[in-house]
């Protein structure tokens, strides 16, 4: 496979029913619980949504890594919501510099695609559009999100495996 600088792809096999996985990625409260964000409302296709980094409730070690960013804005533009199949949003990757206005920068597209398999649900996460990010931020944003999405795939697995977290 050719290494690309424009997109990140991560896959994880989740041992949970499709409806449960869908809820974990499409319900803003559940998503925020494992991802480490508190949103101001629900995910609605075509609508912007504001949030703030709060730290994951699933893994204390990852929560420690998120701690320096707690309270920072986490704003997205929800793109698509196709029940039990696809959820996508746009955001400004690695937009963590205090006082920096990222609104004029291009965004990347984050897509969660779900596919049922005999063993569970295959979640394929793709974030694309890094080649459009300003050069001075591009490599750092790509590297941070490459590692960040690896953590997030572990977090959603833990979230779904923990019966106490299930609503």
What are the residue ranges of the model-derived segments?
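Short amphipathic
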Residues: 7-14
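Hydrophobic-ligand binding "helix-grip"
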Residues: 40, 57-118
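Short beta-edge strand/loop motif at the mouth of beta-sheet-based domains
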Residues: 9, 29-74, 167
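Residue-level recognition of conserved beta-strand positions in structured domain cores
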Residues: 53, 91, 125-127
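Extracellular beta-rich ligand/substrate-recognition surface
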Residues: 1-5, 26
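Lipid interaction determinants
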Residues: 6, 106-110, 122, 151-159
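A conserved amphipathic terminal alpha-helix motif
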Residues: 129-167
């Amino acid at each position: 496979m050719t290494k690309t600088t424009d997109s990140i792809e991560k896959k994880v096999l989740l041992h949970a029913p499709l409806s449960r996985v869908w809820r974990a990625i499409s319900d803003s409260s559940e998503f925020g619980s494992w991802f480490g964000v508190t949103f101001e409302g629900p995910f609605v296709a075509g609508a912007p949504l504001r949030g703030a980094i709060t730290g994951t409730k699933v893994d204390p070690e990852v929560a420690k890594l998120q701690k320096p960013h707690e309270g920072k804005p986490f704003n997205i533009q929800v793109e698509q919501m196709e029940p039990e199949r696809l959820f996508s949003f746009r955001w400004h990757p690695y937009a963590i510099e205090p006082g920096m206005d990222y609104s004029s920068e291009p965004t990347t597209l984050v897509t969660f695609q779900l596919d049922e398999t005999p063993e569970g649900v295959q979640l394929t996460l793709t974030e694309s559009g890094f080649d459009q990010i300003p050069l001075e931020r591009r490599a750092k944003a790509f590297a941070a999100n490459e590692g960040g999405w690896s953590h997030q795939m572990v977090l959603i697995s833990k979230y779904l495996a923990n019966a106490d977290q299930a609503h």
